[in-house]
């Protein structure tokens, strides 16, 4: 099992990541809070500078719905030695989704598909995706899965809630199993994210979905 540290704005800073690594053994991967600017400000530079992340496998996360923005940020990350970037399609915040970014981008699957086609054609980095199931309806998820399966994703990280769920209610575990079944012959690794805050919750996940190979907490 692989364990990933989820990106949390203002919490999973370089100081936090290094403290976790030094005192508790760390995680297999650490994801940064999202980057959204064409050029990095002081705070963003602090997140990604290699000297602030020595010994850590850090994956920068990008938030945008514009291919040219994603590609510019990816090229800037490449200059700092990064090999992979993660696309944020999971943030449920209204200030983000109102601009069709984060989970809000899931509301326009045709535009999302065109965006992915463009970035996968020319991006210098490998690309993973962190996603929700859609906005509010169960019919959205099969459509999104079919889109994701077309592309050579480094990994698909699924938080099995809808954008409208925010962080309320229980995750839709049947949707996560649907992803596992859909991707079983694709070669795309699958990671679970959501409501793993205790050993008991982790064990319950393994009972319900024994094929799970990675967990983001």
Named regions from a protein language model:
Residues 1-217:
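Flavin-dependent oxidoreductase catalytic cores
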């Amino acid at each position: 099992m692989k364990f990933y540290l989820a990106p949390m704005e203002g919490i999973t800073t370089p100081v936090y990541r290094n403290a976790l690594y030094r005192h508790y053994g760390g995680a297999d991967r650490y994801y940064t809070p999202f980057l959204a600017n064409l050029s990095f400000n002081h705070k963003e530079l602090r997140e990604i500078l290699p000297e602030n992340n020595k010994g850590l496998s850090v994956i920068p996360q990008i938030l945008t719905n514009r291919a040219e923005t994603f590609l510019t940020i990816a090229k800037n990350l490449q200059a700092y030695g990064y090999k992979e970037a993660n696309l944020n399609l999971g943030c449920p915040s209204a200030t983000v989704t109102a601009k069709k970014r984060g989970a809000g981008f899931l509301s326009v699957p045709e535009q999302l598909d065109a965006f992915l086609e463009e970035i996968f054609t020319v991006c210098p980095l490998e690309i993973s995706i962190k996603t929700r199931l859609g906005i509010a309806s169960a019919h959205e998820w099969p459509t999104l899965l079919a889109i994701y399966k077309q592309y050579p994703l480094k990994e698909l990280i699924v938080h099995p809630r809808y954008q409208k769920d925010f962080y309320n209610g229980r995750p839709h575990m049947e949707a996560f199993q649907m992803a596992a079944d859909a991707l079983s012959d694709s070669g795309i690794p699958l990671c679970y994210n959501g409501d793993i805050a205790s050993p008991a919750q982790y064990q319950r996940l393994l009972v319900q979905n024994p094929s799970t190979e990675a967990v983001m907490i």
